[in-house]
């Protein structure tokens, strides 16, 4: 997951360069299509011919829509309004939002530290946006709203994918990518310049995004969602602003104000506290389950 976070942090910079030649939708399509081919080859090499159950197809389609299409559509379009480093700080709210979803929809408990962590995440985001208030009316407000749309989409994807834990991660990643490729292809291909006109640098961008961002990325994230769950997986997004900020400064010559840097640190630190406490709650829950199971076995033996 750490390697994935670093590569996805650099992906923002790569995508921004890619959008000089392709529209966000077209870039997203070639990224997903390339990833589909690569994961498909891996699936064939493993001789994995497994399919998705008919009853799970609606969930699979929803995963493709929210995780592969809408999330990156929001992300890429937000880049046209916001610097990469600023965008990733806002997306650092993903873990806290994940805990909120768990509490509201799944009635999973949250202790005081988690609640305070979420509040500090919100404060950190307010610092980031507040420092940018002078130019919000110039269009950045739209960028922030689109970024929050990405946060919602990614959390929906995380919980939907976690519900399909019975499938092999590589197989599930392939079917999600294939489904997304089919869904987005009509619009993307219609508005895309012919591949014969692509520059050498654009081909390298597509290769990176297809191999690392899509193929490797989704195989890892699907596996992580299966093993450690949605909220623990989401915490790793808190470290993307660091990678993205460095890459943005080096390759795009972007900069952040002191207040935005402080806000970013608050978001990352608070998100880390949230996930650590969430992990403690999950571990204590597992211990309780083990104790109850042992007691049940003891009673059965006595009977």
Residue ranges: model-predicted function:
Residues 1-28, 134-163, 182, 285-303:
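Glycine-/small-residue-enriched transmembrane alpha-helix faces in small-molecule transporters
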Residues 7, 11-12, 43-91, 127, ...:
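Specific transmembrane alpha-helical segments of multi-pass solute transporters/efflux pumps
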Residues 9, 13, 40, 64-69, ...:
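Hydrophobic/small/kink-forming positions within alpha-helical transmembrane segments
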Residues 26-41, 62, 113-123, 142-149, ...:
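Hydrophobic alpha-helical transmembrane segments of multi-pass integral membrane proteins
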Residues 26-37, 67, 72-109, 114, ...:
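Specific alpha-helical transmembrane segments that line the substrate/conduction pathway
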Residues 28-30, 86-93, 159-181, 211-250:
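Helix-helix packing/entry segments at the starts of transmembrane helices
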Residues 31-33, 130-131, 202, 238-303:
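C-terminal-most transmembrane helix of multi-pass membrane proteins
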Residues 39, 61, 92-93, 110-132, ...:
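Hydrophobic transmembrane alpha-helices of multi-pass small-molecule transport proteins
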